[in-house]
Amino acid sequence: MHEILPGIFTWAWFSEPHGYNFNGYLVHHPDGNLCIDPVEPPADVLDRLVKEGVARIVITNRNHVRRANLVRERTGAPVAIHPADAPYVRQQGAVIDAELHAGQRVGPFAVVGVPGKSPGEVAFHCPRHRVLIVGDAVIGNPPGKLSLLREKVLDDPARLRASVSALAELEVDVLLPGDGEPILRDAGNRLRELVATFPP
């Protein structure tokens, strides 16, 4: 685990089939630390999560529950996801304790609805620091650019494009993706470049 931004830490798990990293995040906050989309944690990372404490585990979408059950078990932190995605993850064996809704505040972030990949996908935006954390709304691949997942894995491609177009209107300098490489500068421009490729 390393500090990618002040107070935001990340660790990765490489996906051979995809050819890029899946990323988990730990965000320090005075009201309690947040763990976002926790990927498989090596022993030292799991020990650190336990030592530093996690107040809440928040999940961006139904496919990013990942190792939330393990982190919940070890830290005692409740797991939250949007209710539209909750039934699917419960069927997969995930334990969900709370709901996330667009407009809600979670630590330093505003919860932003980005449906399309799944009906309940959310992102986390910190306007003060111009940071956006996403799950599957966009991926950081190829490195330095942003792209969408293949349409066959999207519930509603047109709705996702509309969601991403709305993200491009936010004030964003840094984008931290659940999948792929982070964009640490000019992320708003990378989002707008992606939106410019969408069909009219």
Model segments located where?
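Active-site HxH/HxHxD metal-binding segment of metal-dependent hydrolases
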Residues: 40-107
